[in-house]
Amino acid sequence: MENKKTIYFLCTGNSCRSQMAEAWGKQYLGDKWNVYSAGIEAHGVNPNAIKAMNEVNIDITNQTSDIIDANILNRADLVVTLCSHADSVCPSTPPHINRVHWGFDDPAGKEWSEFQRVRDEIGERIKRFSETGE
């Protein structure tokens, strides 16, 4: 089935939130969607994001931290910004691109429980999207 839609998760550094969103997206949406993530900048995958996803048996050690790819951005069926900075400075998307904002707190530099909380919130949001389309 190569008629998959494309979903593109964006945040500032493609380090924490968008990495977790990509992983959850592949788990919940992978049969119907091509799932990608990127950042305004590429800060590298945060080790605590890797650890947090490992706790829920999802391995993201092979995911890479990437800057926004205009080719993916301009052909995505859905672009999801995960932080207000990415929402405001994201390159403009063509009018036919569906772009939504799902805001999540940035756990970087915060205590471990913040990574767990944000991981779970992102997972629940993507699970809801997989079930309802919203």
From Swiss-Prot:
Q: What is its main location?
A: cytoplasm
Keywords assigned by UniProt? Arsenical resistance, Cytoplasm, Disulfide bond, Oxidoreductase, Redox-active center
The kind of enzyme this is, by top-level EC class, is: oxidoreductase
**SMART domains in alphabetical order:** LMWPc (SM00226)
GO molecular function terms here?
arsenate reductase (thioredoxin) activity; protein tyrosine phosphatase activity
* Disulphide linkage map: C11-C83, C83-C90
Q: What is this protein called?
A: Arsenate reductase 2
Give the species: Bacillus cereus (strain ATCC 10987 / NRS 248)
PANTHER family in the cross-refs = ARSENATE REDUCTASE
Q: Gene3D superfamilies attached here?
A: 3.40.50.2300
